[in-house]
Structure formats: C-alpha cells, structure tokens
Amino acid sequence: MKPFSAIREIARQLLRDEFQGDADQEFADDELDLHINKVLVEISNKRPYEVKETVESDGTREIALDAIKDLIGDKVIRVEYPTGNYPPSELKFSIFGNTLTLESKPTSGEYIYLYCHKVHQVTESASTLSPDLEEVLIEGVVASAGTAFLNNTRKQIVPSSMRLYQAWVDRQSINYQISLNQITRPKAWEF
C-alpha cells in the first residue's frame, strides 16, 4: 500500500518534475492531487471499492443514502435484513434519488446491511487499492497531468519539440487506457 504522497511523488518522477536546485516544479502538489482524485473515480467506475455499510433502522421502510459518502454506479447492490442469518437474508428494495425503500418494514433499532459500491480512497495511512490498481492509478495520473501540461504550454513549445511531447503524452494515455480497460472485477462465489 502506497500512501497518497508516495503516489504523487512517483507520478512526479515519471513526469520528470523532481525538485532540482532553484528550479520550480511544473506541477504543484494540489494540481497533481486533482489528477489523482480524477483517476481514482475512473478506476472506481471499473472496479469499485466494495463495502458493507451498517445502518440502524428508524422503524420506516426508507433509508436516506445521503449519509453514505462516495457511493457510485448502482450505489447499493443488495440489502441484508434481518442480519446474522446463514445464508444471508436478502431483502428486495428500490432506489429513487437518494432514498432506498425496503420491501418490508424493519423494527426500529435493528441493523440493516447495505452492500455498496464506493469510490476508492487513498490517504497517508490507508488505501483501498490493490497493488495492481495503484499502478493503474500512477499511469493515469501521469497521462492526465501530461495532457494538462501539454495543453497549457502548447503555444510556448516550438513545433518540432511539440511533436515529441505529443507523442509521449499519447503513449502515456494509450498505456493508461489499456490498463484501465483490463481492469475486471474479481470472480466471487454466489451463495
């Protein structure tokens, strides 16, 4: 697991933007952070962070999904209620906007498990990415930051150099897209 700052520094090295003497770096930390977060969402759309959220029932059939941060895609995949049974008891539900409506009304104070897809998170102390997804993240950050740099400096670069930069950015973008397209969900056994 690489911390957020390590992801940023590896991307910076691949972009050849390491700090050298009095020279300013081309990419500010917050700029690279924007690219990291953008690519995290792209990766999460291909292979989301799968998590079980525990919600305490208020005695109604409706659950507000606003409190669950970073939901993506189908949001909630399945609902388990009552909890603790084997095999798990799945409950039918529907979602409209940010409200999940259960088929039957649970008792107030009982717990309900929501199996959700969320955006992956990378911090200084934890990461939900596997090592292979960390590599895709770094490739994506390099491609995204390289494209942004090229677009911002296009008028300042002489045409012959521009072709070299454009070829490099295109190659990075293609490598990232290939890696992103190869991401598949791991196979899981259904009970």
Residue ranges and their predicted role:
Residues M1-Q13, D30-L34, K38-S44, P88-F191:
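Internal mixed-charge
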Residues K52-A64, R78-E80, K92-S94, T99-T101, ...:
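Ser/Thr- (and often Asn-) enriched beta-sheet segments in non-cytosolic proteins
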Residues R47, T54-S57, K69-L71, S94, ...:
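A generic structural signal for short, solvent-exposed coil/turn residues
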